[in-house]
């Protein structure tokens, strides 16, 4: 069939995720602030369903990349819409727990995506496909079935009604110059908040990309010896971190302390600094514990920041800011962090110093995130009423 090389597969997956994240997150965020979010979510869901179906019938690597981009646009944009909708379906003091549901759904979807696709692929490989899938390679047939399942999952959205927008300072139809002025007025808070979360994403992405080479080179493990438990560790600690983040955000609001909603992010970022030393642990067990703590802390900060944006910003800024977070974190975190580790490794003596370079970069960016979140907490505005 297509028989793409590893480089081609990396390009397809990378472009499919990065291009939508960087180019479309902000425009979709603006639409979230100004248009009917339920209809927008349905449209984005249809887009990712169409992309999944086109993946099954793509005749070339170029069209396969385009199909994966459609999936990326739909899935990335729908997260922004879901967070905005979730904020208006509940009171501010409940948003930590409400956002937790969205994040758990996202984590479960990613896990099911791997598990269900693998199961369908195995099923179509071991047994004869039904007539309407006959002649398709197993991976293509699996994507046809995934598209059908996705279409069925969209049906409940047809019964969802657009909620009234809460905490509005300017009309959703206000000129963009007014929205820009509102953003500028909050720059002293949003700047460090953006910097803190981008630094967390850099640390998490670098760890995710380079933990496998560290386990192979420094501990002599083969991929089949660690792939399963690393994946389970990242998923499990991500879920635990999301739960802790949601609870801490709601508790922080009740504290009446300025920026109390961000206290959980400050604490998690501080714990993440020593946890970033995981590549230097003397044993695999020690590495796993430190990596799990780091992953959990990243999940805490991610959820706390999402809640803070929906509580401390007026409704007409939320989609734009969430979209900007996704775009900037995607560009810097996914595009820059792995490369920075390789450059530092080269300066320290080459590939043999990968673990040391990863630890150094992780500690530095984790430290930056701690101070950035602390500054954002001190500059946090009052919740919008």
Question: What do these predicted regions represent?
Answer:
Residues 23-61:
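Conserved MFS/SLC helix-loop-helix module at the cytosolic interface between two early adjacent transmembrane helices
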Residues 67-106:
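Cytoplasmic helix-loop-helix junction between adjacent transmembrane helices
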Residues 162-194, 218:
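Juxtamembrane intracellular "pre-TM" segments in multi-pass secondary transporters
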């Amino acid at each position: 069939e297509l028989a793409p090389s590893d480089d081609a597969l990396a390009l397809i997956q990378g472009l499919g995720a990065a291009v939508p994240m960087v180019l479309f997150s902000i425009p979709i965020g603006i639409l979230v602030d100004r248009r009917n979010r339920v209809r927008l979510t349905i449209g984005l869901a249809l887009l990712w369903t169409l992309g999944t179906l086109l993946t099954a019938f793509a005749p070339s690597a170029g069209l396969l990349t385009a199909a994966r981009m459609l999936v990326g646009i739909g899935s990335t944009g729908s997260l922004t819409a879901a967070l905005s909708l979730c904020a208006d379906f509940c009171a501010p003091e409940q948003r930590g727990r409400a956002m937790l549901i969205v994040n758990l759904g996202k984590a479960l979807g990613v896990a099911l995506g791997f598990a269900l696709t693998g199961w369908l692929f195995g099923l179509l490989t071991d047994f004869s496909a039904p007539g309407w899938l006959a002649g398709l390679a197993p991976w293509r047939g699996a994507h046809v079935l995934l598209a059908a399942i996705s279409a069925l999952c969209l049906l409940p959205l047809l019964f969802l009604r657009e909620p009234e927008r809460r905490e509005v300072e300017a009309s959703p139809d206000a000129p963009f110059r007014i929205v820009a002025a509102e953003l500028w007025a909050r720059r002293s808070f949003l700047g460090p908040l953006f910097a803190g979360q981008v630094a967390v994403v850099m640390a998490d992405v670098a760890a995710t990309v380079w933990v496998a080479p560290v386990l192979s080179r420094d501990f002599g493990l083969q991929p089949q010896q660690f792939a399963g438990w690393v994946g389970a560790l990242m998923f499990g600690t991500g879920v635990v971190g999301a739960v802790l983040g949601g609870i801490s955000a709601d508790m922080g609001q009740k504290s009446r302390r300025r920026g109390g909603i961000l206290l959980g992010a400050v604490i998690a970022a501080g714990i993440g600094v020593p946890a970033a030393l995981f590549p230097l642990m003397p044993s695999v067990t020690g590495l796993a514990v430190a990596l799990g703590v780091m992953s959990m802390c990243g999940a805490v900060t991610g959820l706390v920041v999402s809640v803070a944006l929906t509580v401390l910003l007026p409704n007409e800024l939320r989609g734009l800011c969430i979209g900007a977070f996704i775009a900037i974190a995607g560009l810097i975190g996914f595009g820059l962090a792995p490369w920075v580790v390789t450059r530092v490794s080269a300066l320290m003596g080459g590939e043999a110093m990968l673990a040391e370079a990863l630890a150094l970069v992780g500690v530095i960016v984790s430290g930056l995130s701690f101070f950035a979140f602390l500054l954002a907490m001190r500059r946090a505005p009052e919740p919008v009423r």
